[in-house]
């Protein structure tokens, strides 16, 4: 074992929400990766079978374990409407430093989320219609030549 392996290795957490704007009472899912820096390989390596703790607004809501790829997933019910802070913490273990990652998320009212979904659908349909009209205009222009 080299001397660099005897000291604690740096770790980092990367994380994201599957839906960063959930409605009240929906399930919020966060997934992420825990990695450590290997000085010899000069790269970040997945940290397998490590436990991370999940906090929402400073309160512990659960724990997750990383798989063989250093990936973890955790789901919990969305709290009340408003802005919230999620934190994923790795307390460290023999040979590995602790690390944490914070993410902010917004919980919406269910009706507000439905309106936003309808608006997104309408914008998509409008874009499709405009592209269709553009193709028709190009086709007609080419026919008149």
UniProtKB/Swiss-Prot annotation:
Compartments where located: Membrane
Key words of the record: Membrane, Signal, Transmembrane, Transmembrane helix
GO cellular component: membrane
Signal sequence annotation: 1-23
Record's bilayer topology term: Single-pass membrane protein
Keyword field contains Transcription regulation: no
Transmembrane residue ranges: 123-140
This protein's record includes keyword Signal: yes
UniProt name for this protein: Uncharacterized protein AF_0657
Organism from which the protein derives: Archaeoglobus fulgidus (strain ATCC 49558 / DSM 4304 / JCM 9628 / NBRC 100126 / VC-16)
